[in-house]
Regions:
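Targeting-peptide/extracellular-domain and disordered-appendage signature
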Residues: 2-9, 17-170
């Protein structure tokens, strides 16, 4: 009888632990369903709010130096989220056109995140250098954008303002 009770209690404990494990895994699964079921195009405007340049060797800007930025995003005139990016200066194509390898994380309030990365070429501008228009390949997403693919066209309007046109496909 003692052996039977031990077996029943052990079985109940194992079943309880297995049930909790399954429920934990199920609750960790994202609730957001992908929104990208057909091709989508939309534009957000960005305004730079934070900027920091890190010069790793204390000399002129060159390979290995990097910058980090934060941008406020607006869509149809309303706040839409933020963009964080980091660019590392690479070897120049020409002395007047520095290049950088850049990572971008667009966080859209209540929707998810879209990530992208690319090489960016800069051209002389009145304020120093400004990126020439370029396209970013989308590398991933979360939440509503978890299945996003495509590209983002980037056009700088001035030093602190840019437009990002997303061309997303499922």
């Amino acid at each position: 009888m003692h052996r039977f009770r031990t077996l029943v209690v052990t079985t109940a404990v194992i079943l309880s632990l297995a049930t909790m494990a399954v429920m934990s895994i199920a609750s960790a699964t994202p609730n957001n369903q992908p929104d990208i079921t057909t091709a989508q195009t939309f534009t957000v405007l960005a305004h730079a709010t934070n900027f920091k340049m890190i010069n790793v060797d204390g000399e002129d800007i060159g390979p290995g130096d990097y910058l980090v930025e934060r941008w406020a995003l607006r869509r149809s005139g309303s706040p839409a989220g933020r963009l964080n990016d980091q660019c590392t200066i690479n070897f120049n194509q020409t002395p007047s056109n520095p290049t950088a390898l850049c990572l971008f994380a667009f966080t859209f309030s209540g929707k998810g995140e879209i990530t992208a990365e690319s090489s960016v070429v800069f051209a002389p501008a009145p304020e120093g250098f400004r990126p020439v228009p370029f396209d970013l390949p989308v590398t991933g997403g979360t939440g509503s954008y978890q299945n996003a693919r495509g590209q983002i066209h980037v056009q700088f309007r001035d030093l602190a303002d840019a437009s990002f046109t997303f061309h997303l496909i499922p």
